[in-house]
C-alpha cells in the first residue's frame, strides 16, 4: 500500500469505529472500544485481554478488562447499527443463517459452561455454546447477533447466575427458542426479510419451522433422512362414533408416512438432475438433486394438526450408494430447483465464518467469566470482522484477497494508527514510514 492508501484506510477504520461505538457512552469507553478492535485486528496468536494490551502502546490491562467485563454499555444498539449498515453495504442479500458454535473451556466458572455437545469439538466436552444469526450473500457472510445458551443446571442455580452477572430471573431457553429470538431481533431492527437457512439440528424441529412460517419467513432447512413425510396431502379422518359404551375413537390418518431415505431411493432416475450451484476455487461445484412436494408427518401419532406441504430437496452424489442430504423448504411452489439448491448450499459459509472469527480475531479467546463480558467481546469481534469484510468489498481486481489476507494487509494501517510496531514497540519511522 502507498502512504495515501494507508491513510485512507486508516481514516475509514477510524470513521467506522466512531460510528459503530457511538452508543457506548462517554469518550473513554469509545476510546477503549476502538483500541480493543484494533488489538483484535493486529497480528498475535492470542486475542485475550492481556496479550492484546501488550501489543497496544500504553495498553492498560485493567482499563480494557473493566471496559469489556464491567462497563455497563449495551451491546444490542451496537449490533443493531452494524446489522443495518451491513444490509446496505452487502448486496444482493441472500439469506439469514442460523447456527451454533462451541467455546471450549477449562473449569466450571465461565458463564454457561457445561459438559455438553459441541459441533466445534465434534463430541461432548466442557464448553460454552452460542447460537448465532448470520447475514449471507452469494459470496460473503457475517454474524449479526448472538445468544449464549444457558443449560438448565445454570438457570436453576440462582447463586451461580448471580455470580456470573446473568440478568435476574433469566429462564431456561432451548437453542430453538434462542434462534427464534434472534430472528425477532432482526425483524425488530427493520432488516429486510430473508430466507432462513440452517442445518438439521434446527430444520428437524417442527417448532422452529412453524415459528419461521408464523413470522412469514421462507426457509431452506436441513432435515434427517429418517424424517417421516406423506407424499400426498393427508388429513386426519374423524371416525364414526362408537356404538354403546367405551372410549371414544380417536382421529387417525389413512396410511403410513415414509422416511425420506425410502422416498428418495424409490424415485425414478429421471427425477435426478445435475446442477451447478457455484464456481469454487477448484472449479464448478455440482451435484445431483431431486425435488418434490411432501407433507411432513411430525407429530401425527400425537394427534397434532397437519403441517403444510413443503418442498423436499434431496442430494445424491454420483459416487454415493444412497442420497446423503435432505432439506425442507416453504418457498413458493413455483420456485426453481436451482434456487432451492443455491440457498441450501449457502449454509456452508457459516463454517468459514466461525473458523475465521476464531483463528483470525480470537472469538473464543475471551478469558473473562461473566455474562456481560462475553457479550461485549463477541460484539467487538463482530465489528473487527465486519470492517475486514467491507474492505474486501473495495477490491476491484481479482483474485479478491481472502479475509485472513485482508487482515494481514491491514497491519501497516494499524501500525500507522497506534504509532508503534506492536511487536518491538519502536516508533514506526524510517523506510516505509507511516508518519508522513
Briefly describe each language-model feature range.
Residues 31-35, 50, 127, 325, ...:
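Non-catalytic, well-ordered alpha-helical scaffold segments
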Amino acid at each position: 500500500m502507498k502512504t495515501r492508501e494507508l491513510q485512507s484506510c486508516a481514516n475509514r477504520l477510524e470513521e467506522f469505529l466512531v460510528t459503530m461505538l457511538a452508543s457506548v457512552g462517554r469518550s473513554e469507553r469509545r476510546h477503549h472500544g476502538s483500541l480493543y478492535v484494533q488489538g483484535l485486528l493486529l497480528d498475535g496468536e492470542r486475542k485475550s485481554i492481556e496479550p492484546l494490551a501488550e501489543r497496544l502502546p500504553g495498553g492498560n490491562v485493567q482499563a480494557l478488562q473493566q471496559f469489556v467485563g464491567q462497563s455497563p454499555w449495551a451491546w444490542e444498539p451496537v449490533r443493531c447499527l452494524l446489522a443495518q449498515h451491513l444490509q446496505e453495504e452487502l448486496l444482493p442479500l441472500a439469506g439469514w443463517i442460523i447456527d451454533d458454535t462451541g467455546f471450549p473451556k477449562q473449569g466450571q466458572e465461565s458463564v454457561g459452561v457445561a459438559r455438553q455437545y459441541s459441533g466445534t469439538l465434534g463430541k461432548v466436552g466442557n464448553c460454552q455454546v452460542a447460537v448465532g444469526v448470520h447475514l449471507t450473500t452469494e459470496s460473503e457472510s457475517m454474524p449479526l447477533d448472538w445468544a449464549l445458551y444457558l443449560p438448565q443446571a445454570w438457570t436453576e442455580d440462582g447463586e451461580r447466575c448471580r455470580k456470573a452477572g446473568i440478568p435476574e430471573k433469566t429462564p431456561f431457553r432451548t437453542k430453538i427458542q434462542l434462534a427464534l429470538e434472534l430472528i425477532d431481533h432482526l425483524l425488530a431492527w427493520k432488516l429486510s426479510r430473508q430466507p432462513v437457512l440452517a442445518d438439521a439440528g434446527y430444520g428437524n424441529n417442527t417448532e422452529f419451522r412453524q415459528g419461521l412460517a408464523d413470522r412469514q419467513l421462507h426457509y431452506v432447512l436441513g432435515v434427517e433422512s429418517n424424517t417421516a413425510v406423506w407424499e400426498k396431502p393427508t388429513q386426519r379422518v374423524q371416525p364414526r362414533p362408537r356404538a354403546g359404551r367405551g372410549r371414544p375413537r380417536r382421529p387417525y390418518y389413512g396410511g403410513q408416512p415414509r422416511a425420506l431415505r425410502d422416498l428418495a431411493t424409490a424415485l425414478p432416475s429421471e427425477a435426478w438432475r445435475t446442477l451447478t450451484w457455484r464456481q469454487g476455487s477448484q472449479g464448478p461445484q455440482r451435484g445431483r438433486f431431486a425435488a418434490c412436494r411432501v407433507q411432513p408427518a411430525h407429530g401425527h401419532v400425537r394427534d397434532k394438526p397437519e403441517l403444510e406441504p413443503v418442498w423436499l430437496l434431496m442430494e445424491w452424489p454420483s459416487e454415493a450408494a444412497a442420497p446423503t442430504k435432505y432439506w425442507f423448504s416453504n418457498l413458493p411452489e413455483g420456485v426453481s430447483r436451482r434456487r432451492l439448491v443455491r440457498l441450501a448450499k449457502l449454509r456452508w459459509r457459516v463454517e468459514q465464518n466461525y473458523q475465521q472469527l476464531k483463528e483470525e480475531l480470537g472469538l473464543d479467546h475471551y478469558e473473562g467469566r461473566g455474562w456481560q463480558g462475553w457479550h461485549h467481546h463477541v460484539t467487538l469481534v463482530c465489528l473487527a470482522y465486519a470492517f475486514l469484510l467491507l474492505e474486501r468489498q473495495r477490491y476491484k481486481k481479482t483474485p479478491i484477497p481472502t479475509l485472513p489476507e485482508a487482515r494481514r494487509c491491514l497491519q501497516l494501517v494499524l501500525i500507522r494508527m497506534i504509532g508503534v510496531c506492536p511487536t518491538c514497540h519502536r516508533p514506526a519511522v524510517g523506510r516505509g514510514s507511516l508518519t508522513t
